[in-house]
UniProtKB/Swiss-Prot annotation:
UniProt key word Ribosomal protein: yes
Role of this protein: Binds directly to 23S ribosomal RNA and is necessary for the in vitro assembly process of the 50S ribosomal subunit. It is not involved in the protein synthesizing functions of that subunit.
A GO BP entry: ribosomal large subunit assembly
Protein name per Swiss-Prot or TrEMBL: Large ribosomal subunit protein bL20c
Similarity-based family: Belongs to the bacterial ribosomal protein bL20 family.
GO terms for cellular component: chloroplast; ribonucleoprotein complex; ribosome
Keywords: Chloroplast, Plastid, Ribonucleoprotein, Ribosomal protein, RNA-binding, rRNA-binding
Localisation: Plastid, Chloroplast
Gene Ontology MF terms: rRNA binding; structural constituent of ribosome
Keyword Magnesium listed: no
PANTHER family with a match to the protein in the record: 39S RIBOSOMAL PROTEIN L20
Residue spans crossing the bilayer: none
Amino acid sequence: MTRVKRGYVARKHRKNILKFTSGFQGAHSKLFRTANQQKMKALAYAQRDRNNRKRDIRRLWITRINAACRNNGIVYNGIIHSMSEKKVHLNRKILAQIAILDSNSFFGIVKEIGM
C-alpha cells in the first residue's frame, strides 16, 4: 500500500479538538487522545441534558399549576381532566404562566370549566 501523508489535515483536526477542550482540567485539555474522549463525553452529556431540560421544565409547569389549584381547593389532575372534557385548549406552559402572573384569570378559567 502507498503511504498517505495527512499533513495539515491531521494538524487541523487535532487543533480543533484541543480548541474545543481548552477549558477542561489537566490532561483533558492538553493531550489529544484524552481530549478527544472528553469531547465525545461532553457532547453526549450536552445532548442528554438538552432532553432532560424539556422534562424538568414540564415538571415545573405542572408543579406551578398544582400549587395554584391547591390554593383554590382543587387538584391538578381534576383541572386537566375537566379541560380535556370541555375542549379547552390551553397547554401547561400557558396555564402555568397565567396561574403565576394573573391568578384572577386562572380562577376564572377554573370556574369556566366547571371546577
